[in-house]
Every structure is written in structure tokens, then in C-alpha cells.
Amino acid sequence: MRYRFNGRSFLLLGTALVLTFGWRAEAQTQEQVQAPMSLEQCRDLALEHNKQIQMAQADAVASDYLVQSAKTKYLPRVDFAGAWINPGDRAIRPFAIDFNIPGVTPPGLSIPLDLISVAPREIYTGGFTLRQPIFMGGKIVEANKMARYTSDLAHEKVKMKEADVLATVDEAYWRVLSVQEKVRLAQTYKSLLDHLVQDLENVYAEGMTTRNEVLKVQVKQNEAELTLVKAQNGLQLSKMLLGQIIGLEAEQIELDSEIISEEQLSSLLLALENSNAERAEIVMLRSKLALTESARKMVKSQFLPNVFLTAGYNWVEPNIYKGSQNNLGGDWMVGIGVQVPILTWGDRIHQVHIADQEVAKAELELQDAQEMITLQVQQNRFKHAEALKKMELTKLSKEQAEENLRITKNNLLEGMNSVRDILEAQTMWEKAASEDIDARVEAAVTLSELEKTTGALYQYATEHTKAREEK
């Protein structure tokens, strides 16, 4: 049998294919978005999404063009100028007297009056001019240096913005994981109370306990449910904050379930100790110091002469080179120009003193920043060391609280402990587990702060920039 396809059949077939592949693509996209994201993925998204970084990158690109523009100052300038002039009826009047003056006009030289009578006519003029700097007192050299220093400042500003964003996204990332763990903890705590309420109700039904004991646990059960609701709301808000940083909706964010471990912290800290990165602020201040030094040399160049070559070719009509004939005439010229400063009443000296103060100020800023950064690094090292010790102790407290809860639960079944004892043990366990979560997050956040103060985040930003440019 031979099948015949009409236009409607092709339309239905095409629609089915589009819907099928579209559904698969959408499902694949949702699966990709919903996949747990690592810290590195969140960092990359934040660096690509942040508007402040994009503006700083635009400034850096503009500074690169400034460097290229400064290089052209070494090259000759060629200009063209032209004009059309209509002198009017009274602009040039014919001579009405005899130009042959006795005693003045040389013997044998007679200028007829009709030859020196100039009738009004239009004037056309134009020409090319070339100007080539030869020696400008070092102005062009220093201008190129200043352009490069400005470009360095702009690129380091990009790194500084990126490091700020990285520190922000790190903190938001760990906060989401912290609240995520708090939600799990609240769910576990509520589950423990639910089982305890069920057990006590069974015991109460057998007449082995009082209704008062059941009500005590039910009150705790209600409190645990409220805590769970608050934790879930906090998780949604923390995801919204992280999503605003990385450019995703809160529903699209799913992070790795585990908070950083001691082994991961140790490896990251070891890598940090071996890093030789430098803060962008220090690099920027060094560039600023070099910029002020070049500016001082630029001011001192005002004491030196400027030498330049000039050349050109000009046209004019009427042709002044051939008795003002009504045609186009031209001639070339070449020369050397020299400009020597002589007297400015001390203005240049005062400008040099101002430049000296700017250099001294830049040196002090650099020294002050180096001292402050050294102090910040030491402070953050202490904070991270304290966080690691706190994480160690809270982990031990959590293990002890778990053991205490287990023993108390067994004693309750044997009649050796009361409901009050089991509630206290559960509360102690919940508090110890919550403090353990906070301690691990604090250790991760303080490590991120240490990475920023030591310059490791700037190195990460630099590597990310190189990878983006290679793509």
C-alpha cells in the first residue's frame, strides 16, 4: 500500500516532533538546573551575573583603548584646512592714484595703474600641514606610562570587584547550607518528639503514666513544628538572597547536601598557605604611586624646550605666485619649530611642589595599606583558628549529646528516667547539633575571609578571567 501525505499530515507530524523534542529539551534543562550546585559553580555564575563587575570590565576595555591612543602621540599629525572667501564689493578697492612716486620709484621702473587695480573676486585656499614631534621634554613618554598605569588600575579594579563578589557569594552559599541543615535538624527533632508522643500515648492508654506527662511532650512537639516552619522560611529567604547574587530563582537552587568537612578545610587551608597571591589593593596603590611619579615628571618637562618638525603644501586662487592670476597656485614649506619656556613667575615650580606632595601621599597610602592588610590577615588567621577549634568542640559535644540521649531513652523505658529527663536530653541534643552546624559554617566563612585578605580570591578571579578570555 502506498501512503500519500498531504499538507495537513506534514503539519501534524511537524507539530508532534516539535512538542516531543521541546518537552525533552525542557526536561533536560530542568534536570540540569535542579542538579546540586557546588561552590565553584555558584562563584562562576555570580562573576558572570554581577553588574558591578561588568561596569568595571567596560572601564578596563576603555583603558586599553587609552593606551593605544597614547601611542599615537609619537606619530606625525597630518591636517587639511581649506577656505572660501567672498571679499564683497568694498573689501579691496582699486588704486585711484599713480603708484609711480618721484624719488621713491626706481628709475626705469614704471607700474601701470591698470595692473595694480584689483577687482573683487572670490578667494579659494587650502593646504596640508604635517607636524612631527621631535623632543617634547619627555611629555609623550610619560603620557604613555600614565596610560599604562591607568590601564593597570582599571584591570585590578575588576579583580577587586570580583573578589568582593566571591566573598559575598561564599557567605550566601554557606548560609543556605547552614539553614538547609537546620531544616533537616528541625525535621529530625520533630520526628523524635512525634515518636515520643506516640509512645507516651500508648503508655497512657495502659495507665502507666499521667496525662500531664503527655501534654508536656505535646507542647514541645508544637514548638518543634513552629521551629521547622521558621527554618523552612529561612531557607527560602536565604535561597532568594543567593539567587539574587548568581542570577537564578530560588526554586532553581539546589546545593550539595553536606557542609564542608574538616578534611576539606585542611586541604583548602594548605593550598592557601602555599599561595603567593597578592591583594589587588596593593597592586592598585603601586600603580597609583607610579602614576603620580610620572605626573611629576610630566610637570618637570615644562622646564624643557619642545622641538618639532613642520611641513606642508598650500594652494590659493587667485594665484599670488603669478601676479594674482585667476588660477590655482601652490607651494610647499618645511621647517623646525622650537618652543623654550623662559618666565612663568614661579608657576612651574609650584606645580612641581604639588606633584611632590602627591607622590609622598601615594607612598604613605601604600605603606598604610600594607600595614592594615598584614593586621587583617593576622586577625582572620586567629578567627579561622578559633572557628576550627569551635568546630572540633561542637562535634564532640554533639557526639556526647547523642550518647546522652540514647542512654536517657533506654533509662526511660526501664523506668529510671522521667519524661522531663528525655525532653532535656532531646533539647540538649538539638542545641548541640545546631551549634555544630553553625561552627562548620563559621569555619567555612572565616576561611573565605582569609582567602580574601591574603589575596587567594584575587588569584581565583584572575584564573576565571583568563578562562573567560580563552573561550
Locations of the language-model features?
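Acidic, low-complexity, intrinsically disordered peripheral segments
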Residues: 2-6, 28-32, 79, 86-92, ...
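Periplasmic alpha-helical coiled-coil/stalk elements that build and connect Gram-negative outer-membrane
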Residues: 2-3, 9, 37, 65, ...
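Bacterial N-terminal signal peptides
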Residues: 12-20
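Sec/Tat signal peptide C-region and signal peptidase I cleavage site
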Residues: 23-27
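Small/polar, glycine/serine/threonine/aspartate-rich low-complexity segments that form flexible
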Residues: 31-34, 81-129, 256-265, 297, ...
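Small/polar (Gly/Ser/Thr/Ala-rich) solvent-exposed segments
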Residues: 54, 77-92, 115-121, 131-160, ...
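Amphipathic alpha-helical coiled-coil segments
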Residues: 55-70, 161, 165-184, 195, ...
